[in-house]
C-alpha cells in the first residue's frame, strides 16, 4: 500500500514546509526506523517543495494494519491540514531500487 502525505504550507498553525521537513531530521531515529521495518514499511521519504508551498511524504507499507500500528505506537498525528492519499497501481520507468 502506497500512501502520499501532503500538507499545504504554511500550515494553519503557521509552520512552513521546511519546518515540517526539518522536524523529521531529528524526530526519525534508529528506533523509529526499526519499528517501521518490523511493522512492514518498505519505503519512506519526505520532501519540502522548493517554493515552500507544501510538505510531501511517500510511504509504502505491506499492510494497512502495520501502518496503523506504527502510527499508534509512535503517537503520530497528521500535521494541521495534512491529507493522506492511498495510491493504487504501479507503473513507471524504473522499479524501486533500480533493478
Question: Each PLM stretch: what is its role?
Answer:
Residues 1-55, 60-73, 86-99:
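Short S/T/G/P-rich N-terminal loop/turn motif that feeds into the first structured element of a domain
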Residues 75-82:
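A common structural junction motif
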Amino acid at each position: 500500500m502506497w500512501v502520499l502525505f501532503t500538507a499545504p504550507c504554511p500550515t494553519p498553525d503557521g509552520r512552513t514546509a521546511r519546518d515540517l521537513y526539518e522536524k523529521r531530521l531529528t524526530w526519525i531515529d534508529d528506533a523509529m526506523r526499526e519499528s517501521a521495518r518490523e511493522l512492514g514499511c518498505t519505503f519512506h521519504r519526505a520532501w519540502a517543495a522548493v517554493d515552500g508551498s507544501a510538505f510531501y511524504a511517500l510511504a509504502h507499507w505491506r499492510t494497512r494494519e502495520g501502518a496503523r500500528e506504527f502510527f499508534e505506537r509512535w503517537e503520530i498525528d497528521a500535521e494541521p491540514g495534512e491529507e493522506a492519499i492511498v495510491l493504487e497501481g504501479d507503473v513507471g520507468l524504473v522499479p524501486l531500487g533500480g533493478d
